[in-house]
Amino acid sequence: IMTKEQFASIPLREETIEENSQQAVFNAVEMGRLDLASGKHRDAQKKNKIKDQAANTGTTKKQNIPYFEDMNFDSVIADEGHNYRNSFSAGREAGQLAYLPNPAVSKMARDMAVKAAYMMKRNNGRGVVMLTATPLVNSPIDAFNMLSTVIPQEEWMRMGIITPDDFVRVFGKTATVQVQKISGEVEEKQG
């Protein structure tokens, strides 16, 4: 039993972080979002951005404690699971929807996401449980983030989902809405 701060301070091995970022690139290629063979500068930039985002565990490890992988956890049960709901930010599409909050990525949530992915890969899609009494009323991005800690990436890919934008596209229902700007002008937007 440990606090969320103690859990976040447990370091991950560089190999695990690299494997996580390579998996993110592979997922993007599989979904047709990235062409590694094109040789285009834009695709190389996109690949690097995907790798960097996936490799960022969000926390700096300062203590001299064993690596997460060496602790041989077979399960992680996190109370107050809603504390880990900002592990991914909305992409270009979902970020433009009216009334959809797009909070900054939480370092602690990002760390949990990488550790949860490691646990599920090691335990055949199992091993992570999130407990919360906080309802998912904020946004579909919150739902995606929380579900991503307990659903393996392979399962998401079967549904055609690798990003929060995909989740909104598959499960969200949008319509044209009127939004009033600060200037008083009204514009139509997807929301």
Positions of PLM-derived features:
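SF2 helicase catalytic motif II
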Residues: 7, 16-118
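Inter-Walker segment of RecA-like/P-loop motor cores
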Residues: 1-11
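Activation segment
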Residues: 10-11, 85, 139
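Conserved P-loop NTPase motor "coupling/switch" region that bridges the ATPase
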Residues: 28, 75, 91-191
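Residues immediately flanking
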Residues: 4, 80, 133
